[in-house]
């Protein structure tokens, strides 16, 4: 019963009208994915993180990128992120020019983790877009 409730919770809270609630939800989903990867590191939960990469509020995007940093920073989990990375890599790369400085900085840090822990995912073109910024 608890797992059933937890399965529905992100769907409701990730679409909440309050950005604070969306930010908390994404932060916690990231924690769940790291702690209980067999249950929560799945496409059905990763999609919420992917959707919030586009959120209009800075704090939600920052929490989203930080949650992804926690996942990409763990080599044991990166193999399970291949499909997600394929779908959202271009968006993650484009976030380095986000209008909010804090989001752009976290996006660069995320790309560094992807480069270190997932060989061959970032192409030269992706890396070249980061060079002028750093």
UniProtKB/Swiss-Prot annotation:
Q: Which Pfam families match?
A: SCD (PF21581)
List the top taxonomic levels of the source.
Eukaryota, Metazoa, Chordata, Craniata, Vertebrata
Q: By what name is this protein known?
A: Putative STAG3-like protein 2
Supply the InterPro entries for this chain: ARM-like, ARM-type_fold, Cohesin_Scc3/SA, SCD
Q: Does the keyword Membrane apply?
A: no
Q: What is its main location?
A: nucleus
**Recorded family membership:** Belongs to the SCC3 family.
Annotated Gene Ontology cellular component terms: nucleus
| Localization per Swiss-Prot or TrEMBL | Nucleus
List the keywords (alphabetical): Nucleus
Q: What SUPFAM superfamilies does its record include?
A: ARM repeat
Is the Nucleus keyword given for this protein? yes
Q: Which residues form the SCD domain?
A: 10-95
